[in-house]
Regions:
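Helix-turn-helix
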Residues: 1-24
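Short helix-capping/turn signature of helix-turn-helix
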Residues: 14, 76-83
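Hydrophobic alpha-helical connector segments
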Residues: 24-27, 37-70, 120-124
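Amphipathic alpha-helical packing segments from all-alpha helical-bundle domains
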Residues: 34, 49, 68-71, 83-109, ...
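Short, charged helix-capping/linker segments at alpha-helix termini
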Residues: 45, 111-118
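Amphipathic C-terminal alpha-helical segment
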Residues: 61-65, 83-84, 105, 125-142, ...
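Hydrophobic alpha-helical segments that form the core
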Residues: 75-76, 115-134, 150-153
């Protein structure tokens, strides 16, 4: 109403236009994925087992999710806007930071120091993003399965 745009117009619902719509899509995707990560990690008390389980579950369901997904690809969005739209880049960064924090929190609960857990959370998110992109590109869940297996080995070597 405030924008005085016609009721059917995008500006009626999103006065700031496409940027507001994109930002809200980023935030909603972030919330849904964060909730999924939290539920997945809650499946195991041990962080290493939980993270492995989470990646394997993502692999098992990834192509079904891609075909039926209402969420946007945060990787695609962030690589598109990183140099052209600071508002959307920051929205993507905020979401990635939240996801990384979920992993870090799980690691802290398993006895890791806060700073090490923060760094590992970032590494885990990076590893998952890369494996997910490779799996889509190769039309195969093998990269996701390898990531899950190798993360398990890395954590086993830590203990």
């Amino acid at each position: 109403k405030e924008s005085s745009a016609p009721r059917g117009s995008i500006y009626y619902y999103f006065p700031d236009g496409k940027q507001q719509l994109a930002k809200e899509a980023i935030q909603k995707t972030g919330e849904r994925v964060k909730s999924y990560i939290e539920k997945s990690l809650a499946s195991h008390e041990d962080a290493a087992a939980a993270i492995q389980y989470h990646i394997k579950m993502m692999a098992d369901r990834m192509f079904e999710q891609v075909e039926n997904e209402a969420d946007i690809s945060l990787a695609a969005m962030s690589s598109e806007v990183w140099s052209s739209n600071e508002t959307l880049r920051m929205a993507c960064e905020d979401v990635y930071n939240e996801w990384e924090q979920v992993y870090a929190d799980k690691l802290v609960c398993s006895g890791y120091e806060q700073e090490e857990a923060r760094q590992l959370g970032s590494a885990i998110q990076s590893w998952i993003e890369g494996a997910y992109t490779l799996s889509l590109t190769k039309n195969s869940t093998v990269p996701m399965q390898i990531a899950a297996d190798q993360i398990g080995k890395l954590f086993a070597n830590k203990n």
